[in-house]
């Protein structure tokens, strides 16, 4: 038995003392989809302007050790995370996480800028939710977006 399995068995015993059958819970979780935010992998930096400042009320720092620096690194990190989370899930993909060599701004983004994400999601059998990005951008002023 490896460390993860030993730790699970200990947790299973503790939950059993309060009437929770963790095996049943894990079984039920197989049918519940969650949509993980893409920024879990890099603390909201994204790839549109990765050296830009986080503004607009964002409380993240964008500088944690091991943060994904490229879309490919983020996809690898997500694959690992999804392999550890029971069930099949979705990714909530923000606009600033586009994957393109083309220099574009928020008001110029097109579906083609996310083709690699779509290909990856199909291969991994993961759904995609799109989330527009309305912060940390010069066009976001006084609570208005793309003004």
Protein language model features and the residues they cover:
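Alpha/beta catalytic barrel-like cores
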Residues: 1-147
């Amino acid at each position: 038995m490896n460390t993860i399995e030993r730790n699970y068995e200990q947790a299973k015993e503790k939950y059993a003392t309060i009437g929770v059958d963790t095996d049943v819970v894990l079984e039920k979780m197989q049918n519940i989809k969650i949509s993980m935010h893409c920024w879990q992998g890099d603390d909201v930096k994204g790839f549109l302007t990765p050296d830009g400042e986080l503004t607009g009320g964002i409380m993240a720092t964008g500088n944690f050790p091991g943060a994904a620096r490229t879309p490919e690194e983020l996809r690898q990190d997500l694959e690992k995370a999804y392999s550890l989370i029971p069930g099949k899930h979705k990714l909530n993909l923000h606009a600033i996480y586009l994957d393109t060599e083309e220099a574009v701004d928020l008001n110029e983004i097109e579906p083609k800028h996310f083709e690699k994400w779509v290909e990856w999601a199909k291969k991994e059998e993961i759904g995609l939710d799109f989330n527009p990005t309305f912060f940390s951008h010069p066009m976001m002023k006084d609570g208005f977006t793309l003004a």
